[in-house]
């Protein structure tokens, strides 16, 4: 019996070999983990897990992470392997089914990391525990690192924690965005300051769109962010893949007069920092085109004061005045006459009579445009578009316009046009300096009177 051996099957021998290899690997992993902990404060780009992360769909783990239950987290996450697991969530989302011909609920799996969940919800103590257990600071499970989510959700305490433990301030997401790109709300200002103090690059561009943090802040009207980036060396001349500057982004992001105050403040800072008001993108759309298309009179006047040209055309052949006329119907709760008067005062040519139909139901704006002609042109292009109730409310103006169709205007009006022609694009600035009575100055600048004289 002593010379005999127990008969092992081939599958048993293979299982024993795999188990021996697993034990050897586990010994190497533990040794590497101990060495990593000893050098945690030193930059170590090779400090990655040696084997694939395990996935977790355990509801208990999900509840602890998403609710910020620190006591439960301390029980569930006691080693590096647990701290670096992949957390999977499944949610039903509407997706179009070409085969069935209608929208159906389709399960979609999302992956993220425990540390990312904690910092995205502002659970600083939970995040600290995960980091102390060995959670990778710059892991991009699901496309973003923890620092991206902390900035996107504006949690400065979590941002400070991550940076203190060595998170990279310029870590890039799968979309090529840095954490500074994701400081997109007023509340994220402190996050942006912390990133810059940690060495974040203010001029880094995303991979595909090539937007910089300055583009993002300007587009959202974040005037304090814009000021911060400019103080830290942001370049106002950098362009996106579409050729847009930060000033273009600020003017394009001002969606209507109601949101233009913040964007106007951001644009003012950019102009004072040397931004070119004439810089056009690939479609030859200038900042002034964008401001006029959004109906932002104050923003347009700011650009005009800094040298924007009201006569330049974009790729479609439209001037800023054309863009403003097309925006009248899209933004009814504004005063288009202010924008039209500013464009005319800075040298814009009178619009083609066919374009007057766009502001037929805005009598004050229509009056400004009609007073830019030596005589009132044919009213046929716009008279049919006037709403009956509006005609009744402003009958005095509409009747006066019809009565003056192709008729000689007063000598006073012709003199006004002659003075305006002489002053050219400096009409508004010159009128402010001339010693004129207020009523005469308003008349020179096409002030609204309520009727065509």
Swiss-Prot record:
This is Ankyrin repeat and SOCS box protein 16. It comes from Mus musculus. Keywords: ANK repeat, Repeat, Ubl conjugation pathway. The gene is Asb16. Pathway: Protein modification; protein ubiquitination. Residues 397-453 form the SOCS box domain. InterPro entries: Ankyrin-SOCS_box_domain, Ankyrin_rpt, Ankyrin_rpt-contain_sf, SOCS_box, SOCS_box-like_dom_sf. May be a substrate-recognition component of a SCF-like ECS (Elongin-Cullin-SOCS-box protein) E3 ubiquitin-protein ligase complex which mediates the ubiquitination and subsequent proteasomal degradation of target proteins. GO terms for biological process: intracellular signal transduction; protein ubiquitination. The SOCS box domain mediates the interaction with the Elongin BC complex, an adapter module in different E3 ubiquitin-protein ligase complexes. Transmembrane segments: none annotated. Belongs to the ankyrin SOCS box (ASB) family. The keyword Repeat applies.
